[in-house]
Amino acid sequence: MAELACFCYPHLENDSYKFIPFNNLAIKCMLTAKVEKKDQDKFYNSIVYGIAPPPQFKKRYNTSDNSRGMNYETIMFNKVAVLICEALNSIKITQSDVANVLSRVVSVRHLENLVLRKENHQDVLFHSKELLLKSVLIAIGQSKEIETTATAEGGEIVFQNAAFTMWKLTYLDHKLMPILDQNFIEYKITLNEDKPISDVCIKELVAELRWQYNRFAVITHGKGHYRVVKYSSVANHADRVFATYKNSAKSGNVIDFNLLDQRIIWQNWYAFTSSMKQGNTLDVCKKLLFQKMKQEKNPFKGLSTDRKMDEVSHVGI
């Protein structure tokens, strides 16, 4: 995750702003600079290489002292920064909005995946600039639309029906901010269209998840898509979701946290997010993740007969 101000800076033209990507030499200069405390939140002028990000964001970059940041000296950083600027420059950002836009925290890996989709000549985003920019505006929170299959970050498609597409995320192969844990495995499920879904399609998805991904929990971060994650990583996801939700509420950005379909979401996660929306503390909410829940009546009778036992997957073993 990183603020948009880590990728670009605004330049006032007439009554709106044009966004310009940083180059990595300017960032490198900023990372070595001594800056007074009062200037930490201001864009840094490297004199030689142009404008650089505010020094308060130093920890967002990978250095000898901080291996958890972005690999800003890669070509991928430049590609992501340019893509963000293209999207922001396609709309009008006024002086009253610019600070809020640049302070927004976005998923670096999501944006790298959109670059990969853009460069894949078999992908619809390669052929449609309009759809590409729409995908980026959704990714950076500038659009209220949810991420659907056409505008998704992408990955490897492992399941699809008339309503849903399930992607295996490819973060291990990333250049900008790769996941280093070689045991990482996670999926995302997007809606093909943002419209009501038939019970038949939901039943097909639940059957797939129950038989092929029975070692995973289905959760949501509230943004209109599902995540399929290892049970061992659920607590970590809970911490992140709770922190994001509370920070947004504190800054006055009211989030419409989408709980999604209770028949698909893991029961304990649904309880956790419902409790969070009611205003309870993190400790109170997290206890619900580890409680034994009363099994609800199966909304899909006969579901277990949809697959033969020899089809049970070993994904996640």
From Swiss-Prot:
GO MF term list: ATP binding; metal ion binding; nucleoside diphosphate kinase activity; ribonucleoside triphosphate phosphatase activity; RNA binding
Keywords annotated in UniProt: ATP-binding, Host cytoplasm, Hydrolase, Magnesium, Metal-binding, Nucleotide-binding, RNA-binding
One Pfam family per UniProt: Rota_NS35_C
Cellular compartments per GO CC: host cell cytoplasm
Residue span of region RNA-binding: 205-241
Species of provenance: Rotavirus A (strain RVA/Human/United States/Wa/1974/G1P1A[8])
Protein origin, superkingdom: Viruses
EC code(s) of this entry: 3.6.4.-
The keyword Oxidoreductase is assigned to this record: no
Coiled coil spans: none
Description of how the protein assembles with itself and partners: Homooctamer. Interacts with VP1; this interaction is weak. Interacts with NSP5; this interaction leads to up-regulation of NSP5 phosphorylation and formation of viral factories. Interacts with host DCP1A, DCP1B, DDX6, EDC4 and EIF2S1/eIF2-alpha; these interactions are probably part of the sequestration of some host SGs and PBs proteins in viral factories.
Family the entry assigns: Belongs to the rotavirus NSP2 family.
Cell compartment(s), UniProt: Host cytoplasm
GO biological processes: viral genome replication
Main location: host cell
Positions of ATP binding: S107, V108, R109, K188, H221, G222, K223, R227
Protein name in the entry: Non-structural protein 2
Enzyme class, UniProt record, top EC level: hydrolase
Cofactors demanded by this protein: Mg(2+)
Reported function: Participates in replication and packaging of the viral genome. Plays a crucial role, together with NSP5, in the formation of virus factories (viroplasms), which are large inclusions in the host cytoplasm where replication intermediates are assembled and viral RNA replication takes place. Displays ssRNA binding, NTPase, RNA triphosphatase (RTPase) and ATP-independent helix-unwinding activities. The unwinding activity may prepare and organize plus-strand RNAs for packaging and replication by removing interfering secondary structures.
Active site: H225
Keyword Plastid: no
